[in-house]
């Protein structure tokens, strides 16, 4: 369901054939650059060329699907370069708090039930885990799908191609998927959208775009309950450092970083205590 405070449209300025297909897929209106200039503020989804080319000539794989909020620059997902790849190389590997929270086994199978922009899922895959990303927003899922496709193109580093092969994307409501499909996995990871207290200049434009599209997760407790009945080893919930744990069953342990806390729900211990 569209929750953005701005109307969302597909921009056909670049790659019009792909834009038309995407508009049909997402059931969103198609708009030209001229029409967009004359309209009220819009949230546009379309292709963007960031100046980096795969060769001597620009071709279709040089374009990234991006979200264009009215007040910020383009927001896209890139597993090949930029922050996600930097985090893979210099983020601390298995010693980083996120990795310590989820690595219940050497290479656990993980469901990231709140995939968002895919940053944490990419970290899991870079550590050798098979990861299923579940994203309920069709628009964010389209951005993820485009990023996965670009990361497997000829010319992309082999190690990155191997990482993204371990990522699978499902566009669905996570609670419904876990309840109806009962997938087998070791770990389920949740990163609920926390209600924004106030807007600041420091708020990342990716986070602003997510907040516009999906708003806060008001069903986090329901999702946690579903996850606890599916995960084989543990459920991990990412929270702001000083935020309370999600209501319901309390976590067995927590791992903290400067601004974040990872609450760990160990399935075996919870069952032994009669809490599951």
From Swiss-Prot:
Keywords, comma-separated and alphabetical: Cytoplasm, Methyltransferase, rRNA processing, S-adenosyl-L-methionine, Transferase
Keyword Ion transport: no
Gene name tied to this protein: rsmJ
Source organism of this protein record: Hydrogenovibrio crunogenus (strain DSM 25203 / XCL-2)
Described function: Specifically methylates the guanosine in position 1516 of 16S rRNA.
GO cellular component assignments: cytoplasm
This protein's name: Ribosomal RNA small subunit methyltransferase J
InterPro entries: 16SrRNA_methylTrfase_J, SAM-dependent_MTases_sf
Superkingdom of origin organism: Bacteria
Gene Ontology molecular function terms on file: rRNA (guanine-N2-)-methyltransferase activity
Reaction equations catalysed: guanosine(1516) in 16S rRNA + S-adenosyl-L-methionine = N(2)-methylguanosine(1516) in 16S rRNA + S-adenosyl-L-homocysteine + H(+)
Binding site for S-adenosyl-L-methionine: 135-136, 191
UniProt subcellular location: Cytoplasm
């Amino acid at each position: 369901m569209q929750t953005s405070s701005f109307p969302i449209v597909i921009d056909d300025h670049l790659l019009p054939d792909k834009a038309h297909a995407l508009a049909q897929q997402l059931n969103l209106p198609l708009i030209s650059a001229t029409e967009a200039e004359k309209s009220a503020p819009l949230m546009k989804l379309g292709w963007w060329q960031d100046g980096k080319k795969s060769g001597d000539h620009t071709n279709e794989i040089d374009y990234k699907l991006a979200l264009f909020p009215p007040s910020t620059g383009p927001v896209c997902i890139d597993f090949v370069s930029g922050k996600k790849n930097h985090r893979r190389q210099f983020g601390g590997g298995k010693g980083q708090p996120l990795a310590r929270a989820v690595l219940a086994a050497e290479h656990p199978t993980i469901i990231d039930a709140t995939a968002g922009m895919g940053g944490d899922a990419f970290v899991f895959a870079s550590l050798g885990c098979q990861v299923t990303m579940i994203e309920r927003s069709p628009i964010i899922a389209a951005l993820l799908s485009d990023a996965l496709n670009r990361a497997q193109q000829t010319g992309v580093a082999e190690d990155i191609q191997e990482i993204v092969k371990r990522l699978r994307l499902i566009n669905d409501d996570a609670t419904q998927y876990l309840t109806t499909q009962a997938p087998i996995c070791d770990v389920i990871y949740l990163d609920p959208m926390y209600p924004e207290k106030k807007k600041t200049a420091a708020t990342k434009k990716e986070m602003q775009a997510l907040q516009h599209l999906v708003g806060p997760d008001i069903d986090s407790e329901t999702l946690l309950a579903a996850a606890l009945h599916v995960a084989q080893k543990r459920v991990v919930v990412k929270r702001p450092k000083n935020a309370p744990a999600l209501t319901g069953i309390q976590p067995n342990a927590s791992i903290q970083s400067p601004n974040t806390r990872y609450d760990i729900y160990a399935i075996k211990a919870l069952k032994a205590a009669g809490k599951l």
